[in-house]
Amino acid sequence: PPGPTPLPIIGNLHLVDLRRQDKSLMKLAEKYGPIFTLHFGFQKVVVLTGYEVVREALVNYTEEFVDRPSIPIFDQIQNGNGLFFSIGELWRTTRRFTVSSMRNLGMGKQVIEGRIFEELHFLIEKIKSFKGEPFTLPSFNCAPINITFAMLFGDRFDYKDPTFLTLLRLIDEVMILLGSPYLNYFNFYPFLGFLFKTHKIMLKKIEDVRVILRQYMKASREDINENSVRSYIDALIFKQQEEKNKKDSLFHDDNLMASILDMVMAGTETIATTLQWSILLMMKYPEIQRKVQEEIGRTVKAGSWATYEDRKNMPYTNAVLHEVQRFITLLPHVPRCTAVDTHFRGYFLPKGIIVIPSLTSVLLDKTQWETPHEFNPNHFLDAEGNFVKKGAFLPFSTGRRNCIGESLAKMELFVFFVGLLQTFTFRPQPGVSESDLDLTVPQTTFTLRPQPQATCAVLRE
């Protein structure tokens, strides 16, 4: 495909803002069209932008674009194992097993909803303890992260538990490092690794997480039986023992560790950050917050929590949550590569070429959304105020590599968000007005996080 002429050594890196690659890619698409070639250093990459092109690639050509490329930092961490950056039979088997295990553990079912209500209770008690004084947005993270941990480890943590706090800190530090331009440079020029420290710091932190995970794996090994599969770790270890005489079982220690690590990382940051954004956007737009609270008041019985099923009677709230996920473009893109030689929209893409399907360009596609750069819940409502599904709503990606935890994330987000707004009104801290809340320059980590901000939670009568 067409694209800018690469310079020696740097390729087209001078045209890309590494902190907001997604914005740079959309700008280049205006000049070169929805499919173009870019050079990151010596790496040739094909970029796909806009709803039509990205959806066609991920849905109609799902087998062709199913692989992940080799990325130096993830090669060093996972060595081709796990869920996120594995390919081929290892990926297919691990993913299939993970999806069925998570379903058996209640993902997307009512049993997990009970856990979410329990966690909501703890979160609300925590927020009440601030007594209306300002607290930071990451204070919300403990609840959604605990839901993921309960599925992985078999039980929730107390919010003051030292292991819980250590894991939260390490995940946070790893996510921040993943957004660092230096890490990008290491991925483009791994042979210059000796010049960069970031990847070494990162590998050390990942090892600190593994030390904790090994303790849980050891405990699970010691008392596992088929009647006591209480967690994802239990399920993996039970599967490993089932296949221990199988010569080329894919459930070896390295793949088990990599899979758990992927779930710890990807299954926590995304939902926690989305919840932070949802509260920040309610602080920014108090009239939208009020309309959500009015709908909750009409629909949910006083003294009980909204269930996920209630969303069908809460079109405005449902639209607001969808718009939060569209507007924040949380995970701008995760690279793919072609599994086979591929002909796509008149272009030949050889096997193994890196492909970037830009999810940001879909969520902000001006042919699909009336006001793509504004927070506007009407994107998901018809003239009568009914909720409307939109094909271009793809924050979880789509096709064979879509997000494994999508059904869990949607349920958590709805139950937590509604429960919080049922109990509190969220306002900026004293001396800060709605217009002071900056949404335009997110913090680039593995995801796009809101800038550090504080909120005040005022208890509702």
Regions found by a protein language model. Name each.
Residues 103-107, 145, 180-181, 205-275, ...:
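Conserved cytochrome P450 catalytic core segment spanning the I/J/K helices
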